[in-house]
């Protein structure tokens, strides 16, 4: 390589920002924070850099909050005095327990049906080896709480030490609601207990609703149907309801942000006006990665990115360098190999689907890939970097 050749590819930077409060001009804060970071740290902004903003500060600036009483009011309006089957929730104090508190406050009785041995994102309620040993078929077997305890005893999550069966039972009862707990993986199993169902799964919710309706359920709603409009002046989310919400206080939740496209466009324009660079902008939540140790799929939000500028539509269109080096140009080396690979990249087609030289690349949505990178960069704790700047993502070996 020549001494003046570029040596760095994609770079992801966490950008520190002020603490965001309701009513803050978030577009101005984000644009200013990124531009000032570039000036202070000595890097340049470029066309097609990606500015990513975590959904949390978007919702905070919007004041998109609701209380458990708001949740209860909507549940009561939709289910009346019926026994409510609450099925397939994830096991999370931050994500679901606070919602369950509101749901229970709006119902007289809940039949809580938990999927096993794991919830949708991989939190366990039973050990897989024990499932095999006990001869249990999770696909077909419906377990009562008593049978579950007989087979598996008290099962606590590895990282939190929480027995979610007991924890969710207490949440419901403390809200003044009667509860029965069963374990099953077939949505139709709930109809043996009630025909009024609130399905709480995230990514499989459309199929679950269809199955329940086809099986004769009288009332079917999902978490995405609760708080799609304000209750008593609360926040709401027209598209996702309670999905993507987080615990804010012991009595309230922060909802997934709404109407984010205008924010993305505003940030894009502010940066263009001040720097002359046309950047891409997206709002991101959970990354779409899975933890190989804890077996947890991180994506508890309904989508990785609820809004983004148009330049982030689509999937990568890349060649696999090692495939080219090991196959097409296996007899070349040094500068000749570099030139041959560079020529292939420059001349590649606009759609490489089915091309052997593209095998092993990542055919996922750009926003899912970049959002996952940003979630890992910003973290979920005290880093103080709710904005992430990704540079060089759309470059390749020839740039």
Language model regions located:
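Conserved mixed alpha/beta catalytic, RNA-binding, or beta-rich assembly cores of soluble enzyme
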Residues: 2-47, 56-399
